[in-house]
């Protein structure tokens, strides 16, 4: 892990198109401003972890019984 020290108003550049700027330091809290292209996802750590957990649950296999019930329901709705 690269560790860099920055003061309020100073920035870190990543490649040509990402900038992380220290906006303020207040007690034990640091406010960061992040400029990045829309194609780059930027999340707080806890939000990213929650997204990953949701993705794991969504990717779980569906049982044959649940799948058959869904098909039966869809068939009834279309008639």
Curated annotation (Swiss-Prot):
GO cellular component: cytosol
Domain of life of the organism encoding this protein: Bacteria
GO biological process: bacterial-type flagellum organization; mRNA catabolic process; negative regulation of translational initiation; regulation of bacterial-type flagellum assembly; regulation of carbohydrate metabolic process
Signal sequence bounds: none
SUPFAM superfamilies named in the record: CsrA-like (SSF117130)
Gene3D superfamilies in the cross-refs: Translational regulator CsrA
Short name of one Pfam family: CsrA
InterPro entries per the UniProt record, alphabetical: CsrA, CsrA_sf
The keyword Phosphoprotein is annotated on this UniProt entry: no
Gene Ontology terms, MF aspect: mRNA 5'-UTR binding
Keyword annotations of the record: Bacterial flagellum biogenesis, Cytoplasm, Repressor, RNA-binding, Translation regulation
Main localization, broad class: cytoplasm
Subcellular location: Cytoplasm
PANTHER family: CARBON STORAGE REGULATOR
Subunit structure: Homodimer; the beta-strands of each monomer intercalate to form a hydrophobic core, while the alpha-helices form wings that extend away from the core.
Function: A translational regulator that binds mRNA to regulate translation initiation and/or mRNA stability. Usually binds in the 5'-UTR at or near the Shine-Dalgarno sequence preventing ribosome-binding, thus repressing translation. Its main target seems to be the major flagellin gene, while its function is anatagonized by FliW.
Family: Belongs to the CsrA/RsmA family.
Name the record gives this protein: Translational regulator CsrA
Organism: Shouchella clausii (strain KSM-K16) (Alkalihalobacillus clausii)
């Amino acid at each position: 892990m690269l560790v860099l020290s920055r003061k309020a108003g100073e920035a870190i550049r990543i490649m040509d198109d990402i900038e992380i700027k220290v906006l303020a330091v207040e007690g034990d809290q640091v406010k960061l401003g992040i400029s990045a292209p829309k194609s780059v996802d930027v999340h707080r750590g806890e939000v990213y972890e929650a997204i990953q957990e949701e993705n794991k649950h969504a990717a779980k296999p569906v049982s044959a019984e649940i799948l058959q019930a869904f098909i039966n329901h869809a068939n009834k709705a279309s008639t």
